[in-house]
């Protein structure tokens, strides 16, 4: 069986080449492929009907129980013959329908052949996932076929609508299939049918599968796509939308009916929706002018009929359903083909323009009459036999549902008779006020032949109904509850209720035809909303909803993104706290306050933080943020942690200065004012997050099991020869950590500088004082052979300034380069006087760090602040002058000293970082307690100075220089970045 | 250090013995790490014009060697045990980790091909990241043909982080891996050659939000430590079944799970932590986007599976509701938003978000099928997405050579460049989960696992969301094949050998995994040794029997 599929898909792949070579005649060759499938099946039919299905099994993905499993039983056989037989005829028809120069014909031929293959696979598949696979393949192929005229907007739309509706249904069905397979423990359809699982999950699965089936078979509420799909070339309509693809849904229902036909949800859904579709679409068909649309609505109506029949779920219904399915394929396909012939020959298919074709195309006319009689359910056609059986099945089912459904399908059949007559009259008969339609070119024999064959089969089917009965019964008997009086297909059942109903339908149909104008008017007057419009509106609303959601959530605003994350975090973290009553845990008691003065910095912090949210100036905001830092430092101090406080103070100061240096180049105010409401929301989120983190930090204490490590710190500090625990921790107990941290600091310094100095920094800017003038000469960077450009910062040569008062000593020599209005004598004097003091303090902090407040880090920052003061007072050249060592050297030196100390411990002592201590006694001073840790701390000290110098060089002097250059070249300082504040 | 002779009770003993490392088992990590370090040294000492060839060769050889070593190790794993733990049980070598590492290395190699691609000496990266966008200086650099070959060592470090992320066996190692992975990526995101401000903004956003999520991750670790008294996965797992260290401490675990979850879900990019994804994917240089969309996603899910299956494997009931909500939100919101996208990279970003939601359904399943399903899905998605981004790099604006992101420009591409459009069409079909592509098997695998675990509603949502996403994938295919070529039709570059290989790899993987998934499922993806699906409990042990602890 796998070879059938391989043959089809190979033929599909070859089709474009064949069409290129032979033109439309290639369809003859392609028609052989489905024909051979039908021929393959015929000899196997007796065995299959006798109850010995053909099987094929090949594992595909055994881990997921996926397999290439095929099985041909009676139902599959019938479907295969329909799909392959009609497929072959349609391909023949194509050979005359198209012309050689039809654009995209090669692709069309390939896709159509491929579709036939997919359809054959679909009806043979014995694995749920295989079934789904072919199901989706038919969807995709049908999409390509409907969209055959890509240049037509309607064609594209119809194709998109069809694929959207059926894919959605298909995917829903996939869920159902997976649930079904999981509940049954196997994905083999035969296995599931043999031992049907049950339970709520299975019911859900069946409803989901039904959604897929109904969408494929265009049952209400999914009927909209089929009429729209009539944009496709007529052979496609005849094959996909009458004989094959739309039957897939009905096939699936038929396939599962033997196992699940008695489940109420399944029954009610199928019967009610099926009947409703039959009536609704039949009514719509009655007012169509386009013959093809008339047939399309008629097809939807008939599909509803089929669904309703199978939905009844009895053995007789299954028999009638399968018979009706065959009859429908045999009459609807030729009718579509006839429409194609008419369209082709006259150039129109609008029944208001057609007239008098009965005499001009007699063969076509009689073919249509036969097919229409079958459609209307008139004897002696196949349609009659099938419909009689169907009425009988409804009658015998003997439930309220079936009885109501019977009434419904009688109304539907009545409409069917009506629109059959409308078709016949509209296509062929003479009409008043309409001149006979001229034939552009009469249809050739080969063009008409497929329709004749199919119509003839409709006729034969009627007479041979009793011959076909065993085939259909072979399937129908698999439905349980046959009873002792199973129905049989026959042309003549005797005078019974079905026959009576047929007469009623005929009479009603004639009346409808008689009053066709009024019916059309009534239909149009009281039409339900056009399904297509509903679909378009849904799509429109979906996309506008999506746009709104996108606009709301995806506006590119960082605060908004962060807010979303924080809110989610608040929700997911608060829930367990509240739910688990975490506050009932055994946590240490809260100490709200130690001394009243703590309230002052606390209040300052809160006010400053809130104020920060309101201000518009950047600088002010930075100052306010700094105040929260100073407040925290004060709290540290009040809490008895002078080291922390000192470090915090110093760090705050440095950051404040750095901020100010950077803000010089930014607009003074935040660029966009923030909405008050947004600020309030942000405020709430901020407060919420803060409280959450605080609460969690506090509650975590409840989880403490081990003794705190800090219990041992005093002893450790003693051991290390110091009395300042913080300092000892930094430079001794955890010196490895400090090593890591200062390495990071060094890397950060390099990073900050490299952002401004694009090029590798070559040498220290060379500033020195010669007699009478300051020479500030910046070295030329090494010339780069590749480019001729000059990088901005460090190339400017010059700044040779002759001072006005050369012989007077200056407080700060660097100020000579400053403009007069920028100078401040007082500041210069203070800076000059303070500098040695500051350096002295820094050294003091460094030396005493081990036993008192201070340390290398704090000392380094203090020294850095000294540099900072000189820079602020004297400008960048003063900075260059005040410390002649380049920052890179200092940083490297600092790192070397610390590493050296560490290694020295290994060389002279016992291990890395091993150390010693001794007291140095100097005159006039307290004995200085020297330890090897001091050397380590000195490294930190040097490194921190280098870091601050680096920041000043880059963010201070570097930016100054750019600004100077800009002002020289007359360029106004431009703001390079816009801050996102919203 | 001055020896501390304190009593044992007050200070925990610090080991004095160096750990005994099995360098052979660590070799895939070490090779990539070494390549990164050597790359840095190359930057410092090799003349600029020779760096490109050395760096590309170094990076590709390293990734290739690491890949081979990973494969060899799979073969060398003892058949009867799940795997081994190394270096004080901080790193684990088991079948899932080796699988994820192998996939990551393969995807990294594919991305490296894109990264290394140069056209007329132009790579996807800016010549000089520090030059102000639009400045004279930038122009000078462009004219001089400057290039950042630092990209390669950065990528190596990122890949190292990804490898380690899937192999970490305790939360702290995992955190370090997270940072090693993320930091280079933050930087790489800001290096786009064109639309640089955009790229820098993306990098900044990614960095800030990523920093926050890392912080949450750390907070979560602290909470879990408070609950379990340990950060090792095995210990956390044991604590989960014994009820933790303290009475009533379960909320600590819950907060821990939530916060660790937030950290990981951010990396994975699920709603509501997805916001960064479209902006970053769009702004970053496309080869880096490809690396992030494939490698990072695989790594993040690899880690997530390990955390939730092993560490939190005994507390499934506690975290399942959260992941349910996140999965549903992700699949619905991202699918809805994706419909409106007009830019190919943003669309792929949202598609990545939706796919993350699909994979989450497998995590929620918490059974062996979920694990193998997620593995297959990740591998399939990774290759497809790398291929898709490779194609994005080829379609350029005619005037300035930037990538033509606007989808309207892609109209009619099927006529002008049929192979390219067909490849993208295939990738899109795979994203949509159409049968015979890898995407279908992947979706089937995760959905099947979720149904088996009783998460049917999740699967229903997932499938509906697939339908919505299929809508926009199909729309692009329609646009490419059925619409008239656009006025401002893009210039389609002829794929060079590097990009061509990546596209080819994507197509081959998508088709192979779609048509012949059997061999892959059987031989490549680790399977639990004995599937005992008798009881739910038994299933749980089967689920994590794959993981070494």
Swiss-Prot record, chain B:
Transmembrane segments: 26-46, 57-77, 96-116, 148-168, 171-191, 206-226, 253-273, 297-317, 321-341, 347-367, 375-395, 421-441, 466-486, 496-516
A single GO molecular function term of this UniProt record: NADH dehydrogenase (ubiquinone) activity
The protein's Enzyme Commission number: 7.1.1.-
Keyword Metal-binding: no
Domain of life the protein comes from: Bacteria
Any single Gene Ontology cellular-component annotation: plasma membrane
Membrane topology label: Multi-pass membrane protein
Location of this chain's protein in the cell: Cell membrane
Pfam short name (any one): Proton_antipo_M
GO biological process terms on file: ATP synthesis coupled electron transport
Keyword Nucleotide-binding attached: no
Reactions it catalyzes: a quinone + NADH + 5 H(+)(in) = a quinol + NAD(+) + 4 H(+)(out)
Alphabetized HAMAP family for the sequence: NDH1_NuoN_1 (MF_00445)
Summary of the function given for this chain in its UniProt record: NDH-1 shuttles electrons from NADH, via FMN and iron-sulfur (Fe-S) centers, to quinones in the respiratory chain. The immediate electron acceptor for the enzyme in this species is believed to be a menaquinone. Couples the redox reaction to proton translocation (for every two electrons transferred, four hydrogen ions are translocated across the cytoplasmic membrane), and thus conserves the redox energy in a proton gradient.
Subunit structure: NDH-1 is composed of 14 different subunits. Subunits NuoA, H, J, K, L, M, N constitute the membrane sector of the complex.
Identification of the protein by name: NADH-quinone oxidoreductase subunit N
Native source species: Thermobifida fusca (strain YX)
């Amino acid at each position: 069986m796998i070879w059938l599929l391989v043959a089809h898909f190979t033929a599909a792949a070859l089709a474009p080449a064949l069409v290129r070579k032979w033109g439309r005649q290639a369809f003859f060759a392609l028609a052989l492929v489905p024909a051979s499938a039908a021929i393959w099946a015929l000899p196997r039919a007796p065995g299959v009907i006798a109850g010995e299905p053909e099987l094929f099994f090949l594992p595909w993905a055994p881990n997921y129980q996926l397999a290439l499993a095929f099985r041909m039983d009676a139902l599959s056989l019938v479907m295969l013959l329909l799909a392959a037989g009609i497929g072959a005829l349609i391909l023949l028809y194509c050979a005359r329908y198209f012309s050689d120069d039809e654009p995209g014909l090669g692709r069309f031929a390939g896709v159509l052949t491929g579709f036939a293959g997919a359809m054959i696979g679909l009806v043979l598949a014995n694995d749920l996932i295989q079934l789904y696979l072919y199901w989706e393949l038919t969807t995709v192929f049908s999409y390509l076929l409907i969209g055959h005229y890509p240049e037509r907007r309607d064609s594209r739309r119809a194709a998109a609508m069809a694929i959207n509706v059926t894919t959605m249904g298909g995917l829903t069905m996939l869920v159902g299939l997976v649930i079904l397979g999981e509940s049954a423990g196997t994905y083999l359809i035969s296995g599931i049918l043999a031992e049907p699982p049950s339970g709520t999950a299975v019911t859900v699965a069946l409803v989901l599968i039904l959604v897929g089936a109904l969408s494929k078979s265009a049952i209400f509420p999914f009927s909209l796509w089929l009429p729209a799909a009539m944009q496709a070339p007529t052979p496609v309509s005849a094959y996909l939308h009458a004989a094959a693809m739309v039957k897939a849904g009905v096939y699936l229902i038929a396939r599962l009916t033997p196992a699940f036909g008695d489940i109420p949800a399944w029954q009610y859904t199928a019967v009610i929706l099926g009947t409703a579709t039959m009536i609704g679409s039949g009514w719509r068909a009655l007012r169509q002018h386009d013959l093809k649309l008339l047939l399309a609505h008629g097809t939807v109506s008939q599909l509803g009929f089929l669904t309703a029949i199978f939905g009844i779920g009895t053995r007789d219904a299954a028999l009638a359903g399968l018979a009706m399915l065959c009859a429908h394929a045999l009459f609807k396909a030729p009718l579509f083909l006839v429409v194609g012939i008419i369209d082709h020959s006259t150039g129109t298919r609008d029944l208001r323009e057609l007239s008098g074709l009965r005499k001009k195309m007699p063969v076509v006319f009689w073919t249509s009459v036969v097919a229409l009689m079958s459609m209307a359910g008139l004897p002696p056609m196949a349609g009659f036999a099938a419909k009689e059986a169907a009425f009988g099945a409804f009658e015998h089912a003997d439930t309220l549902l079936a009885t109501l459904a019977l009434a419904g399908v009688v109304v539907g059949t009545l409409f069917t008779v009506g629109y059959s007559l409308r078709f016949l009259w509209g296509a062929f008969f003479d009409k008043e006020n309409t001149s006979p339609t001229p034939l552009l070119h009469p249809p050739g024999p080969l063009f008409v032949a497929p329709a004749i064959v199919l119509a003839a089969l409709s006729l034969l089917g009627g007479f041979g109904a009793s011959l076909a009965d065993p085939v259909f019964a072979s399937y129908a008997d698999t439905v349980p509850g046959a009873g002792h009086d199973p129905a049989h297909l026959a042309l003549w059942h005797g005078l019974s209720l079905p026959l009576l109903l047929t007469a009623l339908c005929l009479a009603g149909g004639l009346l409808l035809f008689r009053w066709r104008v009024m019916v059309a008017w009534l239909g149009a007057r009281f039409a339900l909303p056009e399904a297509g419009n509903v679909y378009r509106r849904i799509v429109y609303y979906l996309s506008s909803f999506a746009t709104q959601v996108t606009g709301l959530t995806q506006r590119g605003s960082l605060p908004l993104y962060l807010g979303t994350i924080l809110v989610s975090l608040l929700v997911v973290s608060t829930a367990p706290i509240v739910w688990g009553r975490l506050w009932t845990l055994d946590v240490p008691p809260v100490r709200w306050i130690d001394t009243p003065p703590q309230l002052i910095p606390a209040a300052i912090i809160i006010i400053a933080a809130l104020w920060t949210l309101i201000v518009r100036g950047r600088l002010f905001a930075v100052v306010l943020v700094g105040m929260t830092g100073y407040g925290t430092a004060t709290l540290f101090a009040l809490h008895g942690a002078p080291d922390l406080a000192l470090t915090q103070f110093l760090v705050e100061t440095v950051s404040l200065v750095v901020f100010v240096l950077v803000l010089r180049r930014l607009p003074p105010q935040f660029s966009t004012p923030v909405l008050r409401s947004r600020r309030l929301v942000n405020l709430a989120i901020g407060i919420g997050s803060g409280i959450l983190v605080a609460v969690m930090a506090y509650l975590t204490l409840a989880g403490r099991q081990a003794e705190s490590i800090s219990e041992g710190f005093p002893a450790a500090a003693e051991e290390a020869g110091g009395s300042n625990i913080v300092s000892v921790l930094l430079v001794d107990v955890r010196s490895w950590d400090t090593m890591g941290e200062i390495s990071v600091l060094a890397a950060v310094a390099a990073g900050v500088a490299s952002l401004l100095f694009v090029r590798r920094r070559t040498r220290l800017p060379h500033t020195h004082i010669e007699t009478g003038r300051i020479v500030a000469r910046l070295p030329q960077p090494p010339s780069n052979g590749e480019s001729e450009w000059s990088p901005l910062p460090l190339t400017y040569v010059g700044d040779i300034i002759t001072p006005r008062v050369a012989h007077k000593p200056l407080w700060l020599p660097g100020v000579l380069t400053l403009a007069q209005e920028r100078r401040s004598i007082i500041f210069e004097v203070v800076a000059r006087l303070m500098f040695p003091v500051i350096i002295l303090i820094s050294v003091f902090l460094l030396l005493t760090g081990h036993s008192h407040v201070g340390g290398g880090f704090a000392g380094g920052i203090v020294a850095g602040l000294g540099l900072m003061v000189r820079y602020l007072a004297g400008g960048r050249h003063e900075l260059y002058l005040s410390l002649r060592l380049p920052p890179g050297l200092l940083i490297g030196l600092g790192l070397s000293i610390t590493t050296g100390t560490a290694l020295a411990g290994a060389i002279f002592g016992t291990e890395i970082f091993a150390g010693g201590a001794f007291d140095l006694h100097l005159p006039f001073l307290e004995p200085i307690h020297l330890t090897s840790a001091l050397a380590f701390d000195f490294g930190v000290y040097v490194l921190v100075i280098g870091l601050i110098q680096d920041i000043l060089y880059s963010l201070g002097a570097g930016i100054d220089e750019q600004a100077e250059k800009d002002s020289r070249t007359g360029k106004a300082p431009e703001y390079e970045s816009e801050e996102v504040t919203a | 250090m001055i020896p501390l002779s304190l009593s044992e009770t007050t200070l925990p003993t610090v080991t004095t013995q160096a750990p005994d490392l099995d360098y052979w088992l660590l070799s895939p990590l070490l090779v990539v790490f070494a390549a990164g370090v050597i790359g840095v040294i190359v930057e410092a000492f090799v003349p600029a014009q020779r760096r490109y060839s050395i760096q590309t060769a170094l990076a590709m050889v390293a990734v290739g060697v690491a890949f081979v070593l990973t494969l060899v190790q799979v073969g060398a794993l003892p058949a009867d045990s799940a795997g081994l733990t190394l270096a004080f049980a901080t790193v684990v070598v088991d079948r899932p980790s080796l699988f994820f590492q192998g996939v990551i290395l393969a995807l990294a190699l594919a991305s490296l091909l894109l990264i290394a691609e140069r056209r007329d000496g132009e790579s996807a990266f800016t010549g000089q990241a520090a030059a102000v966008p639009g400045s004279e200086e930038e122009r000078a650099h462009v004219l001089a043909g400057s290039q950042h070959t630092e990209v390669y060592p950065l990528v190596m470090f990122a890949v190292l982080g990804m490898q380690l992320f899937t192999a970490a066996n305790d939360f702290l190692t995992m955190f370090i891996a997270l940072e090693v992975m993320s930091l280079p990526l933050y930087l790489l995101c800001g290096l786009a050659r064109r639309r640089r401000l955009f790229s820098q903004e993306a990098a900044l956003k990614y960095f800030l939000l990523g920093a926050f999520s890392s912080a949450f991750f750390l907070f979560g670790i602290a909470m879990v430590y408070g609950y379990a008294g340990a950060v090792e996965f095995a210990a956390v797992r044991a604590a989960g079944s014994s009820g933790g260290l303290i009475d009533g401490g379960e909320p600590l675990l819950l907060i821990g799970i939530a916060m660790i979850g937030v950290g990981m879900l951010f990396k994975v990019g699920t709603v509501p932590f997805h916001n960064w994804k479209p902006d970053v994917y769009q702004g970053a240089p496309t080869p880096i986007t490809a690396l992030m969309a494939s490698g990072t996603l695989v790594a993040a899910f690899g880690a997530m599976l390990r955390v939730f299956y092993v560490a939190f494997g005994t507390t499934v009931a506690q975290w399942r509701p959260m992941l349910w909500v996140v999965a549903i939100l992700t699949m619905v919101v991202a699918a809805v938003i994706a419909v409106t996208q007009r830019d190919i990279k943003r669309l792929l970003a949202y598609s990545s978000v939706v796919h993350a939601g699909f994979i989450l359904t497998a995590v929620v399943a918490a059974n062996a099928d979920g694990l193998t399903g997620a593995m297959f899905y990740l591998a399939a998605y990774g290759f497809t997405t790398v291929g898709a981004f490779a194609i994005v790099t080829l379609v350029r604006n005619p005037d300035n050579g930037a990538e033509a992101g606007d989808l309207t420009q892609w109209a009619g591409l099927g006529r002008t460049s049929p192979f390219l459009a067909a490849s993208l069409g295939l990738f899109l079909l795979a994203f949509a989960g159409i049968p015979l592509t890898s995407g279908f098997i992947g979706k089937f695998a995760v959905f099947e696992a979720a149904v088996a675990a009783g998460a049917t509603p999740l699967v229903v949502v997932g499938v509906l969301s697939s339908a919505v996403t299929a809508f926009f994938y199909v729309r692009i295919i329609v646009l490419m094949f059925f619409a008239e070529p656009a006025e401002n039709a893009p210039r389609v570059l002829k794929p060079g050998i590097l990009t061509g290989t990546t596209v080819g790899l994507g197509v081959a993987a998508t088709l192979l995994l779609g048509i012949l998934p059997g061999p892959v499922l059987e031989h490549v993806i680790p399977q639990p040794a004995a599937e005992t699906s008798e009881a739910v409990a038994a299933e749980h042990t089967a689920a994590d029997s794959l993981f070494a602890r």
